[in-house]
């Protein structure tokens, strides 16, 4: 049987088949890794610091660009269907 590796970027942990965390079809070693460390939660493995690879609160898009993308996706003029 193939060894499962955690789907978290920069995580080098093996996934325990009896304690796997699934998210979007990928296997992760912990809930923190499955959620991509949204609040900087550490990886449970003492020698792994994959939580450092995530950009907590960072993004490469301005609020104005985000507003425009949202308006393009959900125009205010579209009627809401019941």
Curated annotation (Swiss-Prot):
Keywords associated with the record: Cadmium, Metal-binding, Metal-thiolate cluster, Zinc
Binding, Cd(2+) 1: 11, 13, 29, 43
Outcome of mutating residue 23 to N: No effect on metal ion binding capacity
Residues the entry annotates as binding Cd(2+) 3: 8, 33, 37, 50
SUPFAM superfamilies from the UniProt entry: Metallothionein (SSF57868)
Transmembrane stretches, start-end: none
Coiled coil: none
Expression triggers: Up-regulated during the stationary phase.
Binding residues annotated for Zn(2+) 2, in chain numbering: 8, 33, 37, 50
Protein biosynthesis listed as a keyword: no
List of residues binding Cd(2+) 2: 11, 43, 48, 50
Residues annotated for Zn(2+) 3 binding in this entry: 6, 11, 29, 33
InterPro entries registered for this protein in UniProt: Metalthion_dom_sf (IPR017854), Metalthion_fam14_prok (IPR000518)
Any Pfam family: Metallothio_Pro
Binding site for Cd(2+) 4: 6, 11, 29, 33
Binding positions for Zn(2+) 1 per the UniProt entry: 11, 43, 48, 50
Outcome reported for the amino acid change (mutating residue 49 to N): No effect on metal ion binding capacity
Residue span of region Disordered: 61-82
GO molecular function, one term: cadmium ion binding
Consequence of gene loss (knockout): No effect on cell growth in the presence of excess Zn(2+)/Cd(2+) or in metal-limited conditions. Reduced long term survival.
Family that this chain belongs to: Belongs to the metallothionein superfamily.
Function: Metallothioneins are small proteins that have a high content of cysteine residues which allow them to bind heavy metal ions through clusters of thiolate bonds. Preferentially, binds four Cd(2+) ions. Also binds three Zn(2+) ions but with less affinity. Required for long-term viability. May play a role in the storage or sequestration of metals when present in excess.
Official protein name in the record: Metallothionein
Organism (species): Pseudomonas fluorescens (strain Q2-87)
